[in-house]
Design a protein with these regions (language model features):
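Core catalytic alpha/beta fold that binds nucleotide/phospho-ligands
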Residues: 1-162
C-alpha cells in the first residue's frame, strides 16, 4: 500500500525507493490531471509530463533558457508549432536532468537535443552528465493534450578483457 511503500529522497532531493526496492530506480511527474511514473532496474530513470497548452512566448523562453541551436530550431518552425516544439524539448531536457539527479537548476542550456519530429536525442551535454551516447530518450503522448518524455542512462558496458 502507499503507506508502506518506502519513498525516500537522496541528498539532492531526488526520489528513490528504500529496501526492499532499493535496486529499482524511480521517478514521477504530474501536470494538470495527468501523472506518469517510471521504474527501472540497473538504469537511472527520469520522466516529465507537461500539459500541451498555449505558450505564446515559447520562442522567447527557448532563447533565454535553451541551447542556442535549439532556440534557432524552434524559431525556424511555423509559429503554430512553437508550443509543441518547445514542450517536447522541455520535457526531454527535464527527464534527463531528473534522471541524473540535478534537476532544472543545473541549466537547460547545458544539454543540446535534436528533434526530428518523430524522435529526440541528446547530441551534446555538459561532461557532468556523462556522454550523450549513454542516454536514451523516448517521447510520450500519454493522453490527448499532454506531452511527456522518458530518459534513462544506459549502464556502462563492462571493459573488454583479453
Amino acid at each position: 500500500t502507499a503507506d508502506t511503500l518506502p519513498l525516500l529522497r537522496d541528498g539532492r532531493g531526488r526520489p528513490r525507493l528504500g529496501a526492499p526496492f532499493d535496486l529499482t530506480d524511480c521517478n514521477w511527474s504530474h501536470s494538470g490531471d495527468g501523472l506518469v511514473v517510471a521504474l527501472g532496474t540497473s538504469v537511472q530513470v527520469g520522466i516529465d509530463l507537461e500539459w500541451l497548452g498555449p505558450r505564446p512566448r515559447a520562442a522567447a523562453l527557448a532563447r533565454r533558457f535553451f541551447h542556442p541551436a535549439e532556440a534557432d530550431w524552434i524559431e525556424s518552425c511555423p509559429l503554430e508549432a512553437h508550443p509543441t516544439a518547445f514542450t517536447r524539448l522541455w520535457c526531454a531536457k527535464e527527464a534527463v536532468l531528473k534522471a541524473h539527479g540535478h534537476g532544472l537548476s543545473f541549466g537547460l542550456d547545458r544539454l543540446r537535443l535534436e528533434d526530428d519530429g518523430e524522435h529526440i536525442r541528446l547530441v551534446d551535454c555538459d561532461p557532468a552528465l556523462g556522454r550523450p551516447g549513454e542516454w536514451a530518450l523516448t517521447l510520450l503522448e500519454p493522453a490527448p493534450g499532454y506531452v511527456g518524455a522518458l530518459a534513462w542512462r544506459r549502464p556502462m558496458a563492462a571493459p573488454a578483457t583479453s
